[in-house]
Amino acid sequence: MDSSKIKNVVNQQRKFFQTGATLPVKFRIEALKKLKANILANEKEIAAAITADLGKSETEAFMCEIGLVITEISYMLKHVRKFAKDKTVSTPLSNFPAHSFVKSSPYGNVLIMSPWNYPF
């Protein structure tokens, strides 16, 4: 993929984020469920590719890569509502009777730098 295509993809992702479609927790849960379902549906093909490319056994491919990703997705599915929930914090006496909280919300697009072949 050349730099102009990368730039185009990044711009499309930024525009999509600006629509606010990704803000609801429900959207994030559905995206994680789709990712998990696709990984599970293609588990044998992913394991075969890891075996062919890296020489890992299918067991090692599952334990160290596929299973690891599935476990992380499952963890996020279980806890994403808690992570996105507003957190009550103490309010200075000078602001009585106000209530203070920290609102968790996505910042936007991120760049993830990781090895090209791990996990799969």
Language model feature labels by segment:
Residues 91-120:
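Conserved small-residue-rich beta-alpha loop and adjacent elements
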Residues 1-101:
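N-terminal Rossmann-like NAD(P)+-binding subdomain of aldehyde/semialdehyde dehydrogenases
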